[in-house]
Structures are given as C-alpha cells and as structure tokens.
C-alpha cells in the first residue's frame, strides 16, 4: 500500500537533490528483521508463519554524544498465548473464527532499550537535524507502550510514527484477504465464519523492508547494515 507523499511538507531536504539532510552527527536508523513469509496463498502463508513467527522493527537515535537503540516489543506469551500460538490453538479446538485471535490487543507491551536478541536483515540510515533529534527523543520517552497488537500498536507502527517525526513517510501496510478455509498441516481447517475477519490489514516488517531497500537504492538514506553488524555492542 503506497504513500501519497514521501516527505512531510516541512522535511529537511537538500535543495538540489531533494534528499534528506541533517546536522553533523545526528542520524535516525531503522533496523528491520523481515520474516520473509510466503504470501503466495493462504496455506503457504500460514505454514511460513508457523515456521518463522518472529519479525521485528526497531530504531537507533544518534547524536554526536550518544546512541540510543530502542523499540516497541510485546506479545510475550506470559498472560496469554502469543498471537500465532493462539490462532493455532483455536484451529485445533475447532473455533469458528480462529483468525479472530489476531484482533486482540495484548497488555504486555513495553519499551525495548538496547539490542534485541536477533540481528536485523537490513539497516537504513537517514540524517536528521538536531531539532528532529530532540523531537523524536521526547516523543519516545513520553509515548505509552503497554498496548501491543497486530492490527495496530505493533513494533512497525512505532517505527513508522517515529520516521514521520523525522519528516519521511514509509510504505509499511499490507492487506490480506483470508479464505473461509485453508489447508493447515495437511488438513482443511476453518479460518473464519464471521466475514468481519475476512480481511486483515496491518503494518508489516516485510513490506517495510522492501521500502527501505528501495529508498537506499534510490539515494534516499543509505544502507547501514554492515556498519551495524560490525558494531561492538
């Protein structure tokens, strides 16, 4: 799902190239671990989610003095089953709308400070001004993190709203149309009975990953993956 305008009206852009500029030493990094799910059909998608249920997007805010790595995490599986586990459990139980589990909002969200336990598949760097740095820092510190969901309030949503504060709009949404039934582990299983669960739209690490790579190829921001992986954390 495309964005209408790539940059905010007040974005800090080079007058000649139209690309983002900033003050020396100030940068915003978007770190993305894509799930690389198979979106070919519903059965393939369900199987790939079962194999690789984890994906994550997070950020680094950098100034000449320090570097803050942070993100929004949740779906920890302590009070309730994790999203993918809850769906599969409802499928096994014969629930008429197992996919409806993804419409829940978990209450275990939290601010992640520091490096997560898995490396990113891609890191994108964008220069920002000192003013943008301060704006983003204050937003991150004041933002609420307790709510965490698939359809809203997920890790990618937090990255997207932070990027918007830096003056750039990123492509990140996906819309999935589920069939009423699909094959799961060799058997046809009910996905939904109530048609309100037919379409699932959410912010996707996979979609964001493709957009960030395209931006780097076109000279908007840059690929900082090797730089990040070489850091001594």
Task: Set out the residue ranges of the language-model regions.
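Intrinsically disordered, low-complexity segments enriched in proline/serine/threonine
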Residues: 11, 98-100, 122, 129, ...
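Activation targets extended, charge/polar-rich intrinsically disordered C-terminal tails
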Residues: 2-16, 133-233
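Glycine-rich catalytic cores of cysteine/serine-nucleophile enzymes that process amide/ester linkages
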Residues: 2-117
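A structural motif
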Residues: 110-138
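Weak global preference for isoleucine
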Residues: 30, 49, 60, 91, ...
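Second-shell loop/turn segments in exported
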Residues: 45-48, 118-126, 141-150
């Amino acid at each position: 799902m495309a964005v209408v305008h790539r940059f905010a009206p007040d974005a800090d852009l080079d007058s000649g190239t139209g690309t983002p500029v900033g003050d020396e030493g100030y940068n915003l990094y978007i770190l993305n671990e894509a799930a690389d799910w198979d979106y070919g059909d519903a059965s393939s998608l369900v199987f790939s989610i079962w194999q690789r249920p984890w994906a994550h997007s997070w950020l680094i805010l950098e100034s000449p003095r320090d570097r803050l790595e942070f993100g929004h995490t949740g779906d920890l599986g302590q009070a309730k089953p994790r999203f993918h586990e809850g769906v599969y459990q409802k499928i096994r139980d014969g629930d008429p709308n197992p996919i409806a589990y993804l419409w829940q909002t978990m209450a275990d969200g939290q601010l992640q400070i520091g490096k997560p336990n898995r490396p990113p598949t891609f890191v994108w760097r964008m220069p920002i001004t000192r003013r943008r740095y301060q704006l983003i820092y204050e937003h991150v510190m004041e933002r609420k993190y307790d709510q965490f969901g698939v359809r809203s309030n997920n890790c990618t949503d937090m990255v997207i709203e932070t990027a918007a504060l830096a003056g750039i709009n990123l492509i990140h949404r996906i819309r999935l149309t589920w069939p009423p039934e699909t094959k799961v582990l060799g058997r046809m299983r009910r996905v939904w009975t109530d048609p309100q669960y037919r379409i699932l739209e959410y912010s996707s690490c996979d979609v964001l990953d493709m957009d960030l790579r395209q931006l780097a190829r076109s000279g908007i921001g840059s690929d900082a993956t090797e730089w990040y992986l070489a850091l001594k954390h």
